[in-house]
């Protein structure tokens, strides 16, 4: 094959995998099992796998499929009996590759959900606990209910983790064989379990396998998203006076906004202006706290845009998840940014919080011994999947050839000219009766387009972060004749658009018009996201078409083509029909994709060290939780105090737990302080880096030095507390010494920051608070 080097570079070898997978599936003859009773079919399943064993120290080993064709045939027969679904050969191929630990690419409408569920059964029959990971809780609950009868058939327990469950309910579900859950929910439970003081309070039971739906979205787009557990505590929010001051500052005089609109920089004149207005000698006093507040206010005022990054609803700021076009309830920004935006919008300002612990999604995925996944656009993410997860991509050909027609992009000089062309195009296509799905970049753009269409006499349905509750109903009817649906990012919607909508009688009518027509308004930051939108048309051999409208003012072109010149003569309506213009847009998108990969690689270098340090802290926590190590240390340190407590008749169990709580309190507190320190270091690393030493090297040096002192401080403070705290038969009275854990905690996600450069600034991080 002439391009073997290409597939290897992408972490893929599709031809080899396709040939082998087809050969195995060809041998999977379910008719051999159709005459068996349910009990006999279950027995047959247990005969073709070997269950894993557990060693004395609790580690699992073994567990394998002994006869793959037989297992696939049994799974196919079980799906037919329990779900009334006859899996296609391509779904069986997908299941086979998942069982081999690949990320499989299956086009929209090819049945990824069933393939993933059959793989989950295959893993569970080996005695492995399986987490089926989704992008949101709705899909987790839906798929658990939908695929549940097949798990029940094999006697496998299953359930879905939801954010409204109690700790006891979560503990019960985590003990089951197959658990469905949104990636953020599973991660938040990891964080909460890392703050327990009694092992019995742990809710999670470790899993052996992760089957990840929308794998590229979870493992690439959100790989470096920190999931954060925070405690109530005021944060560095800018005062109202600073917010008002920033509103009066002039761009290019007092501050500069970077060309890519990811950073804002205070000028010397701007710093002098602030110092004069606030009556301070220097912005850099008090460890730069005032400077931080000014920078936060500048970010809120000039980088975060209403109806793009957030909406205001019911007097509150609600953040928008740009990769999914949704609002996640109770979202937050960190570092006072939430309060700064609230002040900017004239709303009541809320308190910030202290980070107790955090973990990136990439580190969370890395906790699973086995990982596989499925998505419609895996191949384009193959390089990242190989580089960061050592995973291979297997491409599964569609069950019916894709006949969608993808027209060449139409590129315009300005966004206004592009938008005019979009409206005219939609009006013309609607006359044919062809349904249209129009993908926009953000909420504001979707609403502006909807208004323009209405003015042109076209009614449309709008699906964005402001009305995502209506998603199921809107998507269900998006394939009806003449229907126009305007939507923000379609990734993770989890629902196929069926031609004719819910009315089967209209299917043929829509087919005659050419099927679903997808219109893209601007290119997304990667071709993979463009393809996710295109992939909504042409499912299961249906006809369909797609066309993207682009302008030279679009973010992807402006950022990816920064500093480059393009000479081309536009037509009267602003259209640039030259082939070189199309090539330039493609180039800009590739540059943007490269920048994102650089940011991923650089940011992972920062987070990798934090992950390694967290692992050390967690190992220490486990020792303290599971042994009497805390009591042994503290009683050895102060023999007289230990003897006195025993004389009081306090049981050994109570004393061990009291010592455990003392030691864990200070360990957790020192870890939280360490995270805050690392945040500060990373914010200012470009200022602290010594000559000829890279910022990442300086960050490593400083973080390792600080971490080396963490354990010693925690132990010394624990010993001091043990000497002084009152310990009764009820345990250690830490509260009487003012050693309180936060009165309230919440969890949130910090999105992979679109406002920062690869240098690692996190000031502009977009955060999504979930609880």
From Swiss-Prot:
GO terms for molecular function: ATP binding; protein-exporting ATPase activity. The gene is secA2. Signal peptide: none annotated. It is found in: Cell membrane; Cytoplasm. Pfam families: P-loop_SecA, SecA_DEAD, SecA_PP_bind, SecA_SW. Monomer and homodimer. Part of the essential Sec protein translocation apparatus which comprises SecA, SecYEG and auxiliary proteins SecDF. Other proteins may also be involved. GO terms for cellular component: cell envelope Sec protein transport complex; cytosol; plasma membrane. PROSITE patterns: SECA (PS01312), SECA_MOTOR_DEAD (PS51196). SUPFAM superfamilies: Helical scaffold and wing domains of SecA, P-loop containing nucleoside triphosphate hydrolases, Pre-protein crosslinking domain of SecA. GO terms for biological process: intracellular protein transmembrane transport; protein import; protein targeting; protein transport by the Sec complex. CDD domains: DEXDc_SecA (cd17928), SF2_C_secA (cd18803). Part of the Sec protein translocase complex. Interacts with the SecYEG preprotein conducting channel. Has a central role in coupling the hydrolysis of ATP to the transfer of proteins into and across the cell membrane, serving as an ATP-driven molecular motor driving the stepwise translocation of polypeptide chains across the membrane. This is Protein translocase subunit SecA 2. It is a peripheral membrane protein.
């Amino acid at each position: 094959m002439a391009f073997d080097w290409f597939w290897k570079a992408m972490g893929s070898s599709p031809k080899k995998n396709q040939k082998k997978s087809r050969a195995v599936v060809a041998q999977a003859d379910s008719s051999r099992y159709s005459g068996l009773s349910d009990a006999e079919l279950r027995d047959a399943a247990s005969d073709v796998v070997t269950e894993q064993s557990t060693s004395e120290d609790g580690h699992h080993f073994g567990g394998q499929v002994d006869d793959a064709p037989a297992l696939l045939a049994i799974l196919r027969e079980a799906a037919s009996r329990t779900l009334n679904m006859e899996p296609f050969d391509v779904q069986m191929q997908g299941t086979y590759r998942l069982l081999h630990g690949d990320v499989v690419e299956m086009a929209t409408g090819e049945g990824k959900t069933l393939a993933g569920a059959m793989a989950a059964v295959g893993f569970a029959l080996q005695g492995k606990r399986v987490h089926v990971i989704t992008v949101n809780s709705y899909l987790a609950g839906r798929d658990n209910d939908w695929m549940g009868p097949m798990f029940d058939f094999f006697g496998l327990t299953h359930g879905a983790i939801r954010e409204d469950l109690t700790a006891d309910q979560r503990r019960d579900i985590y003990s089951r064989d197959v658990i469905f859950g949104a990636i953020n929910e599973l991660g938040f439970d990891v964080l909460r379990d890392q703050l327990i003081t009694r092992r019995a309070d742990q809710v999670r039971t470790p899993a052996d396998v992760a089957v990840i739906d929308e794998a590229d979205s979870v493992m690439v787009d959100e790989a470096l998203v920190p999931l954060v557990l925070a405690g109530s505590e005021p944060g560095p929010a800018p005062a109202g006076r600073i917010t008002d001051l920033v509103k009066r500052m002039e761009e290019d005089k007092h501050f500069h906004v970077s060309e890519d609109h990811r950073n804002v920089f205070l000028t010397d004149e701007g710093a002098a202006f602030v110092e004069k207005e606030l009556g301070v000698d220097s912005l850099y006093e008090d460890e730069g706290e005032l400077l931080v507040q000014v920078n936060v206010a500048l970010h809120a005022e000039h980088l975060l845009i209403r109806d793009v990054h957030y909406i205001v609803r019911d007097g509150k700021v609600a953040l928008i998840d740009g990769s999914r076009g949704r609002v996640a309830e109770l979202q937050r920004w960190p570092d006072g940014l939430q309060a700064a935006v609230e002040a900017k919008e004239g709303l009541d300002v809320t308190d910030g919080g202290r980070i107790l612990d955090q973990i990136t999604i990439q580190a969370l995925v890395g906790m699973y011994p086995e990982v596989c996944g499925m998505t419609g656009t895996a191949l384009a993410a193959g390089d990242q999947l190989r580089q960061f997860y050592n995973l291979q991509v297997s491409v599964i050909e569609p069950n019916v050839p894709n006949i969608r027609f993808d027209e060449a992009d139409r590129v315009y000089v300005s966004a206004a000219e592009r938008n005019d062309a979009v409206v005219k195009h939609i009006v013309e296509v609607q006359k044919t009766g062809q349904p249209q799905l129009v993908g926009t970049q953000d909420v504001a753009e979707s609403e502006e387009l909807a208004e323009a269409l209405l003015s042109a006499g076209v009614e449309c349905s709008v699906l964005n972060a402001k009305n995502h509750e209506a998603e199921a109903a809107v998507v269900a009817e998006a394939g009806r004749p003449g229907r126009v649906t305007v939507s923000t990012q379609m990734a993770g919607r989890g629902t196929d658009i069926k031609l004719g909508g819910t009315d089967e009688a209209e299917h043929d009518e829509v087919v005659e018009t050419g099927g679903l027509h997808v219109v893209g308004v601007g290119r997304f930051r990667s071709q993979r996201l463009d393809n996710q939108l295109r992939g909504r048309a042409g499912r299961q051999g249906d006809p369909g078409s797609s066309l993207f409208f682009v302008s030279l003012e679009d973010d992807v072109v402006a950022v990816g083509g920064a500093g480059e010149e393009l000479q081309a003569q536009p037509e009267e309506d602003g259209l640039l029909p030259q082939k070189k213009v199309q090539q330039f847009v493609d180039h800009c998108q590739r540059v943007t994709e490269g920048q994102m990969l650089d940011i991923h690689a650089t940011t992972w270098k920062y987070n990798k060290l934090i992950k390694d340090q967290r692992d050390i802290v967690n190992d220490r926590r486990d020792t303290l939780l599971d042994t009497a190590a805390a009591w042994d240390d503290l009683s050895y340190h102060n023999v007289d105090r230990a003897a006195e407590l025993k004389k009081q008749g306090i049981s050994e169990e109570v004393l061990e737990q009291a010592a455990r709580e003392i030691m864990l309190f200070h360990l957790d507190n020192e870890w939280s302080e360490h995270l805050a320190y690392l945040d500060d270091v990373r914010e200012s690393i470009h200022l602290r880096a010594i000559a000829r030493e890279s910022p990442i090297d300086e960050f490593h040096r400083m973080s390792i030095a600080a971490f080396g002192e963490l354990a010693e401080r925690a132990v010394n403070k624990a010993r001091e507390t043990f000497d002084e705290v009152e310990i009764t038969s009820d345990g250690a009275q830490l509260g009487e010494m003012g050693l309180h854990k936060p009165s309230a905690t919440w969890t949130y996600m910090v999105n992979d920051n679109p406002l920062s450069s690869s240098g690692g600034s996190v000031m502009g991080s977009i955060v999504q608070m979930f609880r």
